Amino acid sequence: MPIYKTDKKRDGLFLYTVRVNYTDKNGKAHGLTRTAVGAEAAKLLESQLTAEYKTGQITPAERMTVGELAAKYLAAKRTEVRRSTAEKTERILNRYVLPTMQKERLDRLNAQKLQDWKQSVTALALAPKTQKNIYGEFRTMLNFAVKMEHLPRNPLLTVGNFKDTDFTPPTDKLQYYTSDEFLRYKAAALADAETKGTLSEYAYYVFFCIAYYMGMRKGEINALRWSDINGGLLTVRRSVTQKVKGESAVETLPKNKTSYRTIEIPEPLMEILAEYKKRLAARDAYRDNYRVCGGGENGVLTDSNVDRHNRRYADMAGLKHIRVHDFRHSHASLLANEGINIQEIARRLGHAKIEMTWNTYAHLYPRESERSLSVLNKVK
């Protein structure tokens, strides 16, 4: 069972392929090839595959069930993606796919059975985006079965994805604060922090200022250390997830390769950070390796407390409530409305693909429509 080191990297570690060759009961030769990130993960995967082979857990395609496939798929995925990502996939499969499909044999999957499954999910009256996420996870798992030669093709592609029954204009979906609204929100947050007079309350004010001025993800802000700030530059090197089973908060790598980024800090935020640093130092609560908002080496602001403060600040400012992630939208929307190049916005957000940025914020470029009309009006 060989391990091969490739020349590709992910999150700074080399990718390895692990292969096991075996013969089924009919004498047909098969090969399973899986990928692991890093040498340690590759050795662990090799041990796992060896154990499965010796105990007969490697099941020929004609007898493998969806449940058995899910177990193998999740085991492989845990070696390739962040822990929180693997657990999200596991939750979706356990909740929406396996209850009705786990006993179905792969070789007996057909369009009717999969259409019945789709109808059962539709009956749950979930949001269209949630339905499509469920379909995507199931489709990816069956693609894995094709890759591992358990299926000749993916039968789910025949029935297709869920469709939107109603059309909602993008502007109705995207929630954000304008610059004027954020200034009201910011003033309310500062007033609340000053009234309570504690560093921990001031940290929430700083948290939302970073979210708006930098467009960073919630986990990236929680993982931010003072050593990540160098003059007018801030480098995103890590993230924190609070949705890992059995643990309150886990520091992880950023979401993707482009999430590693160095971005410029605007002057208003520089002043806020300088004042916060001054207050921390006055109480001997500042160290270079301390987290900016959570304090200490491993402190975090919990999701529930961040949400609670967010609602309070919005109420105090007389504003509609938006989600914490919508501060990231607010950052991008402000830049888009000012005509900033979409590629620059994608860079600041750390998007893996510029198409993601364009599809989300393209409608916020009103000046482009004015410019195009102006050009056409000259042709007369």
Regions found by a protein language model. Give the residues of each.
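N-terminal DNA-binding module of tyrosine recombinases/phage integrases
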Residues: 9-112, 278-287
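Conserved tyrosine-mediated DNA breakage-rejoining catalytic core shared by Y-recombinases
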Residues: 17-19, 160-161, 223-278
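N-terminal core-binding DNA-recognition domain of tyrosine site-specific recombinases/integrases
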Residues: 38, 62, 74-155, 193-200, ...
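DNA/chromatin major-groove-contacting recognition/catalytic segments
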Residues: 117, 245-253, 338-340, 359, ...
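Short, basic (Lys/Arg/His-rich) helix/loop patches that form interaction surfaces
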Residues: 124, 187-201, 214, 263, ...
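Basic, Lys/Arg- and aromatic-enriched nucleic-acid-binding interface segment
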Residues: 132, 147-153, 157-218, 222-224, ...
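C-terminal secondary-structure termini that scaffold catalytic or DNA-interacting sites
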Residues: 187, 191-194, 242-245, 249-260, ...
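Catalytic-site neighborhood detector that most strongly recognizes the C-terminal catalytic loop/helix
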Residues: 238-240, 270, 349-374
